[in-house]
Amino acid sequence: MDLSDFHISTPLRYFHEEASLLWKLGVFAVLVYFLLPKPTYKTNVKVPTVKYMGPWMPEILSRIFFNSHAPTVIYKGYEKFKTSAFKVVKPDGDLVVLSTRYAEELRQMPSTTLNALEATFTDHVGGYTTILTDSHLHTETIQKKLTPAIGRLIPRMISELDHAFEVEFPTCDDQFASINPYTVFLRLVARVGARIFIGDELCREEKWLQASIDYTKNIFLTIALMRPMPGFLHPIVGRILPSSRSLKDQLSYIQQDLLGPVIKERRRLEASSDSEYKKPDDFLQWMMDLAQNENESHPDNLSHRLLGITSMAVVHTSAMSMTHILYDLLTMPDLIEPLRDEIRNEIKDWNKATQADLSRLIIMDSFLKESQRLNPPGDLSFHRVVKKDLTLSDGLFLPKGTHICMAAGPISKDPDVVSDPDTFDAFRFVKQRTATSGFVSTGPNNMHFGLGRYACPGRFFAAFVIKLILSRFLMDYDFKFETEHKERPKNLLIGDKIVPNVATPILIKRRATKA
């Protein structure tokens, strides 16, 4: 299979190449809505429904308007019902948004009661984005193998990033050069992720890098285009949407031509009598070793899980975070020198940095958390599907099948929770230094990584990747917008999801003093 058949070349194309098709589908959806309004999942929970234009607004219009006005609806609901619960209606179903007063009660409930994987599947249009939800193998591998190994993995991460900085950035010793930051960060993260997740066999193979990056882009393009559609249209849209069709081709290519052969060869060597063979020390091998049954150990499913976890939990989220961070620095350049000073003081030699060195970057850690607070991945978090009828301690009844969540965005900008919430204070969490003030910390007032036993397990690894990239970038480059920007590039809103503008170019120039 020719990889170029499903290559998406630029971020601008990533978000806009199918706009014409989306517009036509949108018109079609509106027409069909009035004829056949059947959301995939509805709920009869007895809580107020919050609508964009008020309670008089017909439900059908509320569903149609949600994708373009989700923040207004969610913030309005939180303002009115932040100590109880409310419902929002989307094109494909209903969400019950619960107050954080339920957090302690819900956070440790088992997956047999509240299922996070099923909620992720629903929220990410899993039937059309190839998301697997039949096992916790990838989560278990992160928790048992990846996170405890971060300290010894950092030298490998540095080695790969050192190579990546040399090959991914243009020559710019004497003059500024233009780059698309999202594209560059995407490739940096993909490279370091590949080194840890699949080892030396494929990590620098362009065919793997491009396939995994394009797979990532197609997942989120498919989500962005399908979420505005009512659920009953998904089977039709999924068949004709180029990004959705490409995902299946990409997955098959990776299973059959890239990872599948690697898995089979590793198993052949394991079964051989070769006493010299030593198992690779990477995420793929850890999953192979932890797999408990035939389904988990099948090469196709191992390939699928590894691709999914790298694409969704490592590459996309880290590249998006890095792009947000860069825009914050470009619009608040007075923060650059304090960050550089801290890097100089705590990391004497970037190429020999340790986990302890990176953990001492408390100003950077606070800055990352503040950037995420004001530019989160979405306004809703703690998504769960209720697997059996559930009555909460105050009597609120949640029937089986209810999709619940919490308003992470409004919570992190609530003046009762955060002082002066509309101000970007890079030192906010340095001054707090509480148990939940760290970038990767979670709690009822800080849920952008989730909450409880199913909070994002890869956040620890991702945080060190981001700190390594940012520390090297800050010390090696000066940077500015390509044109005279006075404001931060506006985020793109896709329903309740928030992404940076990925089409804004910047100029970079190599500094005389490097990491």
From Swiss-Prot:
GO biological process assignments: paxilline biosynthetic process
Keywords, in A-Z order: Heme, Iron, Membrane, Metal-binding, Oxidoreductase, Transmembrane, Transmembrane helix
Pathway it works in: Secondary metabolite biosynthesis
A Pfam cross-reference name: p450
UniProt cross-references to InterPro entries, sorted A to Z: Cyt_P450, Cyt_P450_E_grp-IV, Cyt_P450_sf
EC code(s) of this entry: 1.-.-.-
Compartment annotation: Membrane
GO molecular function list: heme binding; iron ion binding; monooxygenase activity; oxidoreductase activity, acting on paired donors, with incorporation or reduction of molecular oxygen
Cofactor annotation: heme
Bilayer topology annotation: Single-pass membrane protein
SUPFAM superfamilies: Cytochrome P450
Transmembrane segments: 20-36
Entry's Gene Ontology cellular component terms: membrane
Disruption phenotype: Impairs the production of paxillines. Leads to the accumulation of the paspaline intermediate.
CDD domains: CYP503A1-like (cd11041)
Binding site for heme: C456
Family as reported in the entry's similarity comment: Belongs to the cytochrome P450 family.
Function: Cytochrome P450 monooxygenase; part of the ATM2 gene cluster that mediates the biosynthesis of paxilline, a mycotoxin that acts as an inhibitor of mammalian maxi-K channels. PaxG, the geranylgeranyl diphosphate (GGPP) synthase is proposed to catalyze the first step in paxilline biosynthesis. Condensation of indole-3-glycerol phosphate with GGPP by paxC then forms 3-geranylgeranylindole (3-GGI), followed by epoxidation and cyclization of this intermediate (by paxM and paxB) to form paspaline.
Protein name: Cytochrome P450 monooxygenase paxP
Organism, as annotated: Penicillium paxilli
